[in-house]
Amino acid sequence: MKPIKVLIIDDSALIRSLLREMITSDPRLEVCGAAEDPYQAREMIKQLNPHVLTLDIEMPRMNGISFLKNLMRLHPLPVVMISTLTQVGAPETLEALSLGAVDFIGKPKQHSDLGLSQYRDEIIRKLICAAGANVTAMEGVGKAKATGLDAVAQSKSLKTGFLCAIGASTGGTEAIKAVVSSLPLNSPPIVVTQHIPPAFSTSFAKRLDGASAVKVYEAQHQQPIEKGCVYIAPGDAHLKVSKTAKGYICLLDSGEMVNRHRPSVEVLFDSVCEQVGNKAMGVILTGMGADGAEALKRMRDAGSHTIAQDEATSIVWGMPGAAVKLDAAAEVLPLNKVAANIIKHALK
């Protein structure tokens, strides 16, 4: 098999050199070029036909966001953003994902907590995943918002004790937005785990809240779970659901990583299965790996309705694909049908 051709776009010579060294350490990848600004990158894309790009957000002459807008319009390619994993960098990175970037990773730092060897493993994994991503699905995500659910939801009342849990990873920020922004005010309570860094979950929840009729929160420990509300797991804690005499509440757990993740979809789904039982619904959306697939099967076996996003509309059909292989999903649906299905099963 021919190696995946990677084009690095970064104005720092040091970062370009570090990335090149790490990427070329894996025989499945080959650095076909390194550009110091988007203008140079534009010419290199024409000449070298890379399979995937790494793109810095902050660059002179033209920033990464402007370049990404043009690229996705004229020559869509899988892109992994190299961004500052801070609250300051979060809005720009989330915007890059909304414009069609597949994934993001922090900048390599020689003295970071995440050692360079761990960073190398992560960027290699993300580049290989991005190279196989469904770029045409990216174009459809923004159009996946469902309409007309208000009238349906207003005509009936919600089932008592019903709760929906959603899990996602790569491509998930936009897939979750497509689902949540389609929901009417009369929606069931929804809990969400998206693999995201700690500094990003607050921005993600705010961004979703601004785009939706329902109220979206970054989940707090012991926060009551109410209808018409969506609760997003913080980037450094597992989100669990607990049943109390007054109703469901959110619990946050900073314990060990599960399936290499904290928050983990598996942890959320298992707690929902245990606490909500057959009144729950489980939804697994686009994402790399298999986090949540086995727990979704346990939810289905316990009598919950379960959904996996279909391959055609998934950026990466890892997690939903794993769920389908395990027969964990009662239905496999395109992204634009998920919100309506949640409402259908939530109403009496």
UniProtKB/Swiss-Prot annotation:
One term of GO molecular function: protein-glutamine glutaminase activity
Matching SMART domains: REC
EC number of the protein: 3.1.1.61, 3.5.1.44
GO cellular component: cytoplasm
CDD domains named among the record's database cross-references: CheB_Rec, REC_CheB-like
Family: Belongs to the CheB family.
InterPro entries: CheB-like, CheB_C, CheY-like_superfamily, Sig_transdc_resp-reg_Me-estase, Sig_transdc_resp-reg_receiver
Organism: Saccharophagus degradans (strain 2-40 / ATCC 43961 / DSM 17024)
Modification(s) after translation: Phosphorylated by CheA. Phosphorylation of the N-terminal regulatory domain activates the methylesterase activity.
PANTHER family in UniProt: PROTEIN-GLUTAMATE METHYLESTERASE/PROTEIN-GLUTAMINE GLUTAMINASE, PROTEIN-GLUTAMATE METHYLESTERASE_PROTEIN-GLUTAMINE GLUTAMINASE
Protein name (database record): Protein-glutamate methylesterase/protein-glutamine glutaminase 2
GO biological process, one term: chemotaxis
Catalytic activity of the protein: [protein]-L-glutamate 5-O-methyl ester + H2O = L-glutamyl-[protein] + methanol + H(+); L-glutaminyl-[protein] + H2O = L-glutamyl-[protein] + NH4(+)
Catalytic residue list: S169, H195, D291
Modified residues (4-aspartylphosphate): D56
Location of the CheB-type methylesterase domain: 157-348
Record keywords, A-Z: Chemotaxis, Cytoplasm, Hydrolase, Phosphoprotein
Domain of life, per lineage: Bacteria
